[in-house]
Amino acid sequence: MKKANIEFSRSFFYLVTLILILAVPGCGVKFIADYDEATDKSVTELQRKVEGFLVDIERKVGTDDAAYSNNTEFYDEVRVDISAIRVRAAAREKNEITLEQLDLVQKNLDNLEKLHELGFNSPEEIEPLRKAFNASFTAILKFELAKKRGEKI
């Protein structure tokens, strides 16, 4: 009887092991959120808005139209846009990387605003800010597109 129990236990163990070996590869463990078309589109729209603002300021440097006090509405609008994108991203599980990237966009906006308050003296001062924003936007969009393709990240 003991021998039969031992044989049954071994057979059961091997059967369970075989089932697990076959089942585990079929279980796709996800470490990041899925692609989100709304985030993709919102970030693209935000990039266009920021780029449009930078182009406008470049043209107006040295005029009253370029003064910070005449452009505070832009900063308010972009803060609302970033907040809306961030809330959506936070509502999705395993989306921490996108949230970190959005935090960098927010820091870039904070830096732009501080520099704008000090005043721009030449259009060349805008280019490093543009590069920082575009690097952040590109990172977010590349990450979303990689999710869309289902790449291992």
Task: Please describe what each predicted stretch is.
Residues V87-H116:
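Structured, soluble extracytoplasmic/luminal domains of envelope-associated proteins
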Residues K2-V16:
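Bacterial N-terminal signal peptides that target proteins for export
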Residues D34-E58:
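Post-signal peptide N-terminal segment of mature Sec-exported envelope proteins
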Residues F53-K94:
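Alpha-helical segments in soluble extracytoplasmic regions
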Residues L22-G26:
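C-terminal motif of bacterial Sec signal peptides marking the signal peptidase cleavage site
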